[in-house]
Regions:
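Conserved, structured core segments of small domains
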Residues: 1-98
Length: 98
């Protein structure tokens, strides 16, 4: 199943610092997901001043439970970066043929 995940950061004064402190671990997780085919695309959501305030992810997992298990271990979850997460099932256009 394919999913569109929109995750908005906490808005407290320390939110960006937590994001930056957890960024390398989060990106290491993304690199693993790219290698195993579960990460299709994604990136940071920016505000009007180019400050990172959230993330969007296009992911593929066998089912919603597998996605939920993955998200629970993401450094942006465990590091209190993402506050609100919206998950929708999607049918995404492939970037390259399989």
């Amino acid at each position: 199943m394919q999913f569109v995940v929109t995750a908005m950061d906490f808005k407290d004064p320390g939110a960006l610092d937590r994001r930056m402190a957890n960024r390398e671990a989060h990106l290491a997780s993304v690199r693993k997901m790219i290698a195993d085919g579960t990460f299709l695309s994604g990136g940071a959501i920016l505000d009007a001043s180019d400050k990172m305030i959230g993330s969007t992810l296009h992911l593929e997992f066998p089912d919603r439970a597998a996605l939920d298990r993955h998200l629970q271990g993401d450094p942006y979850i465990t590091g209190k970066v993402w506050e609100h997460i919206d998950i929708k099932v999607a049918r995404l256009v492939p970037l390259k043929p399989k």
